[in-house]
Amino acid sequence: MFEIDQRARRLTDKEKDQYSKKGYVTGIPVFSENAVQDLHNWYDELSSKLPNDIDINKTNMWHKASKKFYDLSRTPAILDYVEDLIGPNFVQWGGQFFSKEPKDGSVVPWHQDAQYWPLSPANAVTVWLAIFDT
């Protein structure tokens, strides 16, 4: 569906250790530059088709509303990274766009998502795919 970056791989022990200690890992390759542009274009196209009263960023469960989003969330490279962090038995709980376009002025303070979720134990992973260069 979307071209995988040739650098996609399993997480290193160092990355898994960082996740265990700090709760995050960054800079993990998933999609090629062409695929990122395709994702950006798809986001723009989808946004333009929504009614004005629907904010694409405040709508959850896109994996249930869009086959393309569903397939995106099941990209093997992404699932491998999640498995490296929490093991092979997991489910997708949500699916949401979170667009913070360059120079839009919005601020998201540092936080860990698990404190906002009704999950117990809080053994969860957020996968954030950056498609905008902020």
Predicted regions span which residues?
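Non-heme Fe(II)-dependent double-stranded beta-helix
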Residues: 1-22, 26-119
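Short, conserved beta-strand element in jelly-roll/cupin
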Residues: 111, 118-134
